[in-house]
Amino acid sequence: TLFGVLPDTEVEAESTILGLCTGDADSIMPAIQKTYWDGIDLVAAAPILFNAEFLLPSRQANDPDFAFWRVLDSGLEEARNFYDIIIIDTPPSLSYITINALIAADGVLMPLPPNALDFASSAQFWSLFTGVCSSLFEARGETKQYSFVDILLSRVDKADLISNDIRNWIVSAYGPKVLPVEIPKTSIAASASAEFGTVYDMDVGSAQAKTLKRAHD
């Protein structure tokens, strides 16, 4: 929606990676569309992608040689020749789509709010992902390595003492993987997202200049 596309009404299956999941397409290129930002292209996502959670295991069951976790990686092969950076945004769940995204990625950036439940969920996620991928790769003699796995603290409220304690837990658990940059919790970001935008889409006159500058920085 931040790119001006409404997922529920304006996104067709052909504009997503669903064709890769069904086997009707072998490249992501036909799904790529331009945006109003020069140099930034988009492959849309929509609720229709939940069909992949049934399509991929069904294809795996019918074809033992099929590797469901390599669908997106293979589909991106051609696109890698045309883009300097490809960003894949996934839901915070260990779904078939998320597994595909993590296998296709060269690096991982996890936004993590300093919240007890989010911190616990992140630890459980990595434990589950490691277990799943180990079993998948060991069976086929494959390996997976990342150039980086970084944690980005988001929605940080430095006035919240409990959040500061949990932030220290996160730093203790993930060590140098926690980036020195933090995204502050601010009402400006909430106001911008309510208008289907970001803090960079707001003008200074629409909010307190000091608060907006802090969000920009």
Question: How should these model regions be labeled?
Answer:
Residues 1-217:
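P-loop NTP-binding core
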